[in-house]
Amino acid sequence: MELKKLGKVAKGQDGAVFGGMLFRFDATGTCFVYKIRDLSEESTPLCQFVLDKADRIAPHSNSVAFGCARYEEKDEFPLLYSNIYNNYAKADDPLKGVTCVYRLQRQGDSFCTTLVQLIEIGFTDDPVWCSGADVRPYGNFAIDKEKGLYYAFTMRDASQTMEYFSFPMPALSDGIYDEALGVKRVTLCKKDILEQFSCPYQQYIQGAVCHKGIIYSLEGFTDSAENPPAIRLVDTAAKKQTCLTYFKDLGTTVEPELIDFEDGICYYADHDGNVFVLNF
């Protein structure tokens, strides 16, 4: 692997790429939009926006992805997915395993979103998901667009493994109406699991993406010897980890955050906003 620097954007969490634009999210629901072709060391965002209802339910955006389906067929953008992760870790309801689904619309250089659905893992307190004293029991997700699958995966501390679950991708019409948020909430139960498998433990999961059946999952913290920045490749067909690469071997030790593909190109960004093409 090698990194090729493209420029610098706002600090933040994961994000997504679509139509030659990079959408960089922070942990409060704010997104900065950049044209990839215009990236430089002093990149100016095309615009910024705040996710709908972020004052009531704000994703950490530990994992972000565009799906395949659109809210309306004529929409420019597919549905946008962003997870809560640990934003409500100290709340009565920590919203473990919850992903928010948005309709993204553009008018000129302005963007707005509408919260249209919630997807939640309905068994986060079950031993099949958690192992008792997990430090981060919130789970990440990745979407296999080619096969129409929703992958959820979580850190299991007791067994020192990652547990992966696949589900049919929820349709926008699925779910039960949530009066509080005014959208449908899909609860994925154990009976909905298509496949389940274990892989080696990851040291604090960050952004993730599924591309051609491979989950590219980031992990680690800046300059941490105990939890070094790294990327793992998980083959969902073979149900095994096929690659572990430490970013120090690629010339950086900054916390990894964002990863996505467009037109066969892998885009990667760290917490500080450095954006690269990641070549394999």
State the predicted function of each range.
Residues 3-31, 206-207, 216:
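Beta-strand-rich domains and repeat architectures in extracellular enzymes and scaffolds
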Residues 28-36, 79, 87-105, 158-172, ...:
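Structural motif
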Residues 76-142, 146:
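Hydrophobic alpha-helical segments and helix pairs
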Residues 190-236:
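Loop/turn-rich, solvent-exposed surfaces of beta-rich toroidal or solenoidal domains
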Residues 255-280:
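Blade-level signature of beta-propeller repeat domains, shared across WD40, Kelch, NHL, RCC1
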